[in-house]
Structures are given as C-alpha cells and as structure tokens.
Amino acid sequence: MQQKALSALEFHKVKEQLTEHAASSLGKEMLLELKPSRSLEEVKKLQEEVDEAGTVLRLKGSAPFGGLTDIRKALRRAEIGSILSPAELTEISGLLYAAKQMKHFLEGLFEDGVEIPYLHQYAEKLIPLSELERDINSCIDDHGEVLDHASETLRGIRTQLRTLESRIRDRLESMLRSSSAQKMLSDTIITIRNDRFVIPVKQEYRSSYGGIVHDQSSSGATLFIEPQAIVDMNNALRQAKVNEKQEIERILRVLTEKTAEHTNELFHDVKVLQTLDFIFAKAKYAKATKAVKPAVNADGYVRLIQARHPLLPLDEVVPNDIELGGEYTTIVITGPNTGGKTVTLKTLGLLTMMAQSGLHVPAEEGSETAVFDQVFADIGDEQSIEQSLSTFSSHMVNIVDILKDMTENSLVLFDELGAGTDPQEGAALAISILDEVCQTGARVIATTHYPELKAYGYNRENVINASVEFDIDTLSPTYKLLIGVPGRSNAFEISKRLGLPDYLIGRAKAEMTAEHNEVDTMIASLEDSKKRAEAELKETEAIRAEAEALHRDLQQQISEWQEKKDKLYEEAEQKAAEKVKAAMKEADDIIQSLRMIKEDHKAFKDHELIEAKKRLEEAVPSFEKAKKPAQKKTDKRELKPGDEVKVLTFGQKGTLLEKTGAAEWNVQIGILKMKVKEKDLEFLKSAPEPEKQKTIAAVKGKDYHVSLELDLRGERFENALHRVEKYLDDAVLAGYPRVSIIHGKGTGALRKGVQDLLKSHRNVKNSRFGEAGEGGSGVTIVELK
C-alpha cells in the first residue's frame, strides 16, 4: 500500500486511537505496525476475528488479559545464561497465568456454543506451563520478593538474621537508656550506616566510646558510632546477609534455568496473547466508533451506507452513502472549496484501508468494501520543500507516480485535480488524467472546483458527477453528498444574501457565457429534482412502513382468531364426545336391563340385541381423526309417528314413535329408544299402512344356539379378537357361566392377545389356562359375570 496514501489519509491517527484500547504494550506494538492487506481471504479472516471478539465483549464485557507483559527481553537473557531478577520471573509467572486464564476463558465460551472458531484456534495454541508457574510462585511473591520458604537454607538464614538484629537492637537500646549516656548522645535513636547498626554521639564525647565511626552529620557535631560491644554481632549480621544474597542468587539461577528450558513455548505464548490483545483492541475500537463488519469482495465494488469519518467527533460528523464500482467506476465531485469534498474523498479512502486492515468500518449494516491491490492518494498541499517544488509541481510528481503504478484493481483518489495552475490548462489536464485512469479500469474519486468538469459525468461512460450540498440559508455546506448532481459555486446567491446590490449581481451574470448559464440552470434543476425525489422516497418509505405494520397487525389478528376457532372446535368436539359416551353408557345400561328381563321374557332375540349394540358403537364419530360431516337439511315434510327416518348424528335408520317437544322426537333405533332433535333427523319414507296383525310365536332364547367353546385356530389375529368379543356377548346373553376359547399354542401371539382382551373385558370375571384334561395352555377357560 502506497505510504503516501497512508499518510495523506491519516491512517496513523487511526492507529493511535486503536492503541488506547490495547491491554498491554505488546498489543500497542502490534497495532502501531498495522497495515492493510491485499489478500481477500486474509481480510475476511481478520474481519471474522474482530467480529468474534465483539461477540465475546457483548457477552462478557471484557477478556482476561491480567498479567500480560512483554517478557521477551527477559527470555533472551535467560537463553544466554544471565540470572533473571525476581521482578522478571514474576512477570514470566504473570504471563503464564494470563495464558492459562485466556485459554480457559475462550475454550469455555466455545464449549457453551458461542460461535468463535478463530478465537478458539488461538486458545488451543496457548501452552500452559503450570509447573514452571507453580515453581516461580512458590519462591517469589507478587511484589518480586523471594519468600522465606523458597528453600530450607534461606529460611534458616533469615531466622538467623532476625535473631541477630533483635540482639543488636536490644543491646543498643540498653546503651541509650543508660543515664550516663544521655548527655553524650545527640538523639536516642538507633540508625544504620554502611549497612551496620550505629548510634548518634556528640563530637566532644568521641573518646568516651570505643568502636568505629561510620559517618558524621553535615555540621560535624554528631558522629555515628558503632560501639565496640556490638562489632562482633554486626559482623555476624553482615555475614548472614552475604549468605542470604548467595542463597537467593542460587534460587534465582535454578528458576532461570527452568525458564530457559521453555523459552520457545514462552515466546509462542507471548505471540498468541499479543495477537489476541491486538484483535480485542480492534473490537473495542469498533464498539467505540459504532463500526460494523463490512462484506468484502475482490470486484472493486464499494458501498458504504451512512459512512462516517472516524477522526471527526461522532456528534458532529455527517454520515453519507457512497457507492463506487457498480454502475460507475468514477465519481467527480465538483463545487467550491471548503465545501466538504475532501472529507468525502478521505472517508472512502480511509474506510477502505481500515477494512483491508481487518478493522470494522464506521457505517451501517449492509456496507461493503473492496480489497484493492493499491490505494493511491493525491491530497492536500503537501509541497516537497526539500526539492523546492511548487504546489502544482509536487502534485504532478505524485500523479506521474500514480499513473505509472496503478492497475485495474487500484483505488485512486485525486483532491483538487489540476489545481495550482492556469484554470483552463488545469481543467484540461484534469480531464486528460481522468480519461487515462478510467481507461485502466481503476476505481476513481476526484474532487475539483473547475466548472469545465461539471459536464464530464454526462459525456463519459462509467462516470458520474457529484457534489456536496450547500445551504443557502445558513451560507454553509451541509456536507451531504449528492450523487448525480454536479456542484456549483452559489456565489451569486451568497452575495445577494450578504447584501450585494441586485444590479451588481445582474451585471455579473451578464458577463457569464450563455453556455455557463445553461449549465448552472441545469444543475439547479437537477438539485431540485433530486430533493423532490428524496422527499417522495421518504414519503413512500413511511407509507410502506405503515403498510407493513398494518400487515403484521392483521396477521396477528388472523392468528389469534384461528387459535380461538381451534380452541372452540376442540371444546365442541370434547362436549360431543362426552355426549356420545353418555349415550353408550345408557345403551350398556339398557342391555343390562334387557338381560334381566330376558330371564322372564324370552320374546327378544339375543343376536338382535348384540347387533343393535354393535351398530350403536360403530355410530360413534371419530373426533380425533376427522371432522363431523356436514348435516343434510331435513326434509320440510311434516313428520309423523311411524315415519322411517335417518338419525344424522349416528348415521342409523330409525322409526318415529312420538313427538316429545316442539322440535324433538322419541325414535326407535333397533331395540333402543332415544330422544333426538328434529334438526338431526332426515325423512326417508312414510309409515306403512296398517296391516292385519298376525300372531307370531315368540322365539325363546334357548332356540338361539351358542356353543360352549370357541375355536380360533387358523384365524388371523385381528379377526380372532373380533370373534372373541362377539362370542363373549353372545355367551352372556345365553346365560352361560363359563366358556372355553381354543387358541392353540403356536407362537403364543394369539394366546397373549386373547389373554390381554379378557383382562379388560367388562363381562369377564376370571380366566385361566386349561388343565391337562381341558387342553392345557392351548385353551383358556373364561368365567363370566
């Protein structure tokens, strides 16, 4: 990426802002080295990493970087055999702790289902050296002090030191308390000079004290003397301190050697944690700038939605939509200076570089950026002072380099192209340069205040004009980019609002060429048309939003209505099922009553009773599987007793007995009588004409033969069970107390099916397999109620 472009677009300032979000000097170092990538795959990976870090920050608020410091210098010292200091070893322990915590943190999130595949890969790369961390922590505390229990030898030495110091202080304090010594001392304190305990003695009493003078006050009036009585103890103390130093050095050497054995792993952990700090800093920056992850492509297409310049205050910057590389590859922004053209140009260039560096861009969702092989920029008044070149010359030197190095996959930014020379010549050069760049297929944004370029977008393919909106009322630019509308100076309008007489403005307009006036008129018309279109679009969007809201409301109401309807239907089904069950129970009661009557009155045929009950059972509607069929309209014919009708509720034929209400009949269905609503009756035929009754002999129950055994051998399973049910009903009506069911032995499936049916049958009192003389397990003996 061209260094001049990075500098002109102030990419270094973005990096400076980034470093504020790093957790360590390692992260800051990596951020300051940040550069745009030219690889589409790498850019996608970098964007995903930042997006994953953003997810972690949203879920957890932060990542554990505590203890992360730059230990690389200490590791290099360990490699060459230098003894590391306690502070350096503490930093190494801190880094190992950071690696352990980060690994546990990221792997835990991944195991919980958080989508962070890239961050999880980094976590897997971390190498926790728990033993080395434990060894360091057992010898050195968090403040870099070697602990007493670092070794037994050190513990003994420090015990000796404390004992000696205590004895020396006790002896000196007794000297200070002596009444004879009070007048000879400058102060009753114990102090240390040259690492030895001393007391302050007045100069004139020097001869009264034996011992060694180690120092004197600045005035010379006080001498700091080590009394002879404690010289030996001070010597012993001094030797103990030497021993302590040697033991500490030995401990540090051992820890350093252990560290040196793992420098490769430690350097590796440093790099991984540095990269993670780098990634999370970018995610924090994205959050601070309200940036989003852009889609990226290699097609040279850029679409930034409500893009904001990241170096401008968030509450002041004006967002703009910028699109390039689709319908047009070149944008020419025209208009007066100080109109905000350069900000737009820099925004596109800087956001492109940010995206290629793996940074999210300050724009709205749906934004897309391209990965260019080069970004070239000729911006501002960067004169080459060393070469004593003019503004025009310095720009032209840069432009020549751009024309030489650009490709079809480059982004080229020209600010005030052709400025700094004669306007006509500058405009002509600008047009020629733009034609050359456009011919290569590069993506271009150029700003200019030359009116000659206003028509450029109308007579060139893949080129469009643009301008920055100017508010005549406030006499200031709004910084709103207007694509498709060339800019104009607005000099006449501004002058008029500032009080310039109309006649002077009229004279000035008269000096303008007719062609220029036509262009200005065209521009004004375009601006008005664009404003109207934007207003209509805004109104349309509002109507669409209202329609969508109404649609959602209707959908919700329909859904609620459907739920209510389904609930009512379920309740109706339940009530209907309950009524049918009640009717079935009533039928069972009727049959039971008929059995009792049968003992005294044998006029009823048993098989007719069973068939009548079966018809009633089959008439029960299946509410769970199908909806009740639509009822047919009852014939308007007036019903009368004796008419044959169809009971729609059960789908059975019956005979009207008598009318029991305004719209209710008593109906005979087989042997059953029940009350039915007239709306549930369908007329079939009128009652037959009365015939002369014939005497019919009643058929006795015993004339209807029911065998004492039922043979099921060879029957299909379902048919066999159906026969068992019918047989049991027949046997009950026949008055049998006990019957036999022959099912055979076979596979045992039929036998088990019969046994299961008998257990739940209402008329079975008990059942058992046959005895040896009754057929064994191939026969079941059934006792009836």
From Swiss-Prot:
Record-linked Gene3D superfamilies: 3.30.1370.110, P-loop containing nucleotide triphosphate hydrolases
Function: Endonuclease that is involved in the suppression of homologous recombination and thus may have a key role in the control of bacterial genetic diversity. Acts as a ribosome collision sensor, splitting the ribosome into its 2 subunits. Detects stalled/collided 70S ribosomes which it binds and splits by an ATP-hydrolysis driven conformational change. Acts upstream of the ribosome quality control system (RQC), a ribosome-associated complex that mediates the extraction of incompletely synthesized nascent chains from stalled ribosomes and their subsequent degradation. Probably generates substrates for RQC.
SMART domains: MUTSac, MUTSd, SMR
Residues of the Smr domain: 710-785
Keyword list, A-Z: ATP-binding, DNA-binding, Endonuclease, Hydrolase, Nuclease, Nucleotide-binding, RNA-binding, rRNA-binding
Assembly description: Homodimer. Binds to stalled ribosomes, contacting rRNA.
Domain of life: Bacteria
Enzyme class: hydrolase
Organism: Bacillus licheniformis (strain ATCC 14580 / DSM 13 / JCM 2505 / CCUG 7422 / NBRC 12200 / NCIMB 9375 / NCTC 10341 / NRRL NRS-1264 / Gibson 46)
Binding residues for ATP: G335, P336, N337, T338, G339, G340, K341, T342
Protein encoded by which gene: mutS2
CDD domains according to UniProt: ABC_MutS2 (cd03280)
Protein name, entry field: Endonuclease MutS2
One term of GO molecular function: mismatched DNA binding
Enzyme Commission number: 3.1.-.-, 3.6.4.-
